[in-house]
Amino acid sequence: MKDMDIKAVFIGDKAENGPVYKMLLNKMVDEHLGWRENYIPSDMPAISEGDKLTPDYLATRDHMIEVLDEVSQRLRAGSIPWHSAGRYWGQMNAETLMPALLAYNYAMLWNPNNVALESSMATSQMEAEVGQDFASLFNMADGWGHIAADGSIANLEGLWYARCIKSIPLAVKEVLPEKVKNMSEWALLNLSVEEILEMTESFTDEEMDEVKAASSRSGKNIQKLGKWLVPQTKHYSWMKALDICGVGLDQMVAIPVQEDYRMDINALEKTIRELADQKIPILGVVAVVGTTEEGQVDSVDKIIQLREKLKDEGIYFYLHVDAAYGGYARSLFLNEAGEFVPYASLAEFFEEHHVFHHYVTIDKEVYEGFRAISEADSVTIDPHKMGYVPYAAGGIVIKHKNMRNIISYFAPYVFEKSVKAPDMLGAYILEGSKAGATAAAVWTAHRVLPLNVTGYGQLIGASIEAAQRFREFLEQLHFTVKGKTIEVYPLNHPDFNMVNWVFKVQDCTDLNAINELNEKMFDRSSYMDGDVYGERFITSHTTFTQEDYGDSPIRFIERMGLSKEEWQKEQQITLLRAAIMTPYLNDDRIFNFYTKEIAKAMEKKLNEIIK
């Protein structure tokens, strides 16, 4: 199929596709019931017609119905309507894909466990294919991936890979010293992933087991592996990962971000060189594609260039890209053959595939950041974010399939004798039991919406277009409330689809008062104000503190007419925050309707707040 209509793959804001969903769900349930009935039909039924007429049976059935009625009532009363086409402007939540929901519902009836092939033959194969989808999305020809519970687990696994691989040369020096003779400890700690994998390829299976036993999994030499460098915009899961992996929070170094909230590459190089001068190695660097609070895209290409430059000087680091939020957006740049389209051809490419309905800008720096992900050693990607599939579905992909043999807990030669395809996941991942229904959901989503411009590119293009238009809408917005003019200041041009903004009383130069106003707006526009089902505008918020962000917000502070001194006094700013994931707002009719509606809702809330 050339280009898809994304309105056909969601249940719909007003359940417009509800009849299709119900028809397909009933069809699939009927097929499952028939599958049960047709399994050795001559077997005696375990539940007889007489059983179904007994008082205890009937009472139990009625009690079950009552409990499920309560579940329905509690979910309807206590859930946030983020399916809305234009009322919800908050967290990374939106409509989920109808095919993914149906596949999850259907596969759940079999309750497959993807940790073992014997309990999930169908869905284990699906997960293997999803892992290959991830590798193809990032143009990693030798890559391998799998689904994880979430991005935090995937990040933890990325650090696990980095720690284990970095420790292998020291383990080789201990148990097979002849393999690394004449190499200093510094040289061993600065070997590339490819050099380490090439070294281990010559080992026998027994030698490899010895080396792994002496690696970081033994607890030895972990503090020798060096620092873990993250941007100030890091996700909080990295602190937990450093703790759990035994690397320690003291080994984490936060690299400053620029005014555009991307990692400062000059600061990164300076930090690495200062550490190298002290003979402190770099365990790894994290780049973020789609930061949690701002949606920004770090310059992965410049980090790769820096790594190549430093490699010539005998300094090397593992690179993990945390693309939990932004990873799926790489589909936007891939043609149907999976090729990354040149930047010079991008405008024509988007026009050919009708990606955008209005003028949308994709910065060259953002484009290059996405392009360079293919050079990372591992990448986090979350289907339950921009993949629009149900929770819980994170994911990770590694650049070289052989990397997994470094972290495996069962010798691959044992599994390969008894397990052909797909691979026995349990040997290579952090998790144990895992839902096969998740694999079915992600696999189905990837087949209905290919990971290129004709599929996910259409969906994510709609999201990016809506974000840029929403920011333009906010820029032009102002209100007159009780004789005061309320201005709206969007943060920055979004690299992706996140928009942050601040409400401010005109001529107010008191940052504390501005923060209070925006805290109150959040309280009035979220679950903090109680039941949100009747809310006409729902949003989220965040706080940029000097402790976390340094002085990167100063430019924004000054744009609002405040002084640097005011920032230094308060050292934090509260912003309203929206991940624009709704798939419908690239439609002019819908965009115009909802922007008018939420402007009215904003004005009403401001009238309630402003004294």
Curated annotation (Swiss-Prot):
Q: Which InterPro entries match?
A: GrpII_AminoAcid_Decarb, PyrdxlP-dep_de-COase, PyrdxlP-dep_Trfase, PyrdxlP-dep_Trfase_major, Pyridoxal-P_BS, TyrDC_C, Tyrosine_deCO2ase_bac
Q: A GO molecular function for this record?
A: pyridoxal phosphate binding
Known cofactor(s): pyridoxal 5'-phosphate
Which Gene Ontology biological process is one annotated for this entry?
A: L-dopa metabolic process
Q: Which residues bind pyridoxal 5'-phosphate?
A: 151-152, 292, 382-384, 433
Active-site residues are 413
The answer, when asked if Repeat is one of the entry's keywords, is no
Q: Which residues carry this modification: N6-(pyridoxal phosphate)lysine?
A: 385
User: Which pathway, per its entry?
Assistant: Amino-acid metabolism
Q: How is its activity regulated?
A: Levodopa decarboxylation is not inhibited by carbidopa, benserazide, and methyldopa, that are three human L-dopa decarboxylase inhibitors.
Is 4Fe-4S among the key words of this record?
A: no
**Reactions catalysed according to its record:** L-tyrosine + H(+) = tyramine + CO2; L-dopa + H(+) = dopamine + CO2
What is this enzyme's EC?
Answer: 4.1.1.25, 4.1.1.-
Record-linked PROSITE patterns? DDC_GAD_HDC_YDC
Keywords attached to this Swiss-Prot or TrEMBL record, sorted alphabetically, are: Coiled coil, Decarboxylase, Lyase, Pyridoxal phosphate
The free-text function statement in the UniProt record for this protein reads: Catalyzes the decarboxylation of L-tyrosine to produce tyramine. Plays a role in acid resistance since tyramine production via tyrosine decarboxylation appears to provide a cytosolic pH maintenance mechanism that helps the bacterium cope with acid stress such as that encountered in gastrointestinal tract (GIT) environments. Therefore, may contribute to the colonization of the human GIT by E.faecium. Also involved in drug metabolism, being able to catalyze decarboxylation of levodopa (L-dopa) to dopamine. In gut microbiota this enzyme is in fact exclusively responsible for the decarboxylation of levodopa, and thus reduces in situ levels of levodopa in the treatment of Parkinson's disease.
* PANTHER family xref list: PTHR42735, PYRIDOXAL PHOSPHATE-DEPENDENT DECARBOXYLASE FAMILY PROTEIN
Q: Which family does it belong to?
A: Belongs to the group II decarboxylase family. Tyrosine decarboxylase subfamily.
Record note on quaternary structure: Homodimer.
Q: Can you say what this protein is called?
A: L-tyrosine decarboxylase
What organism is recorded for this protein?
A: Enterococcus faecium
- Gene that codes for this? tdc
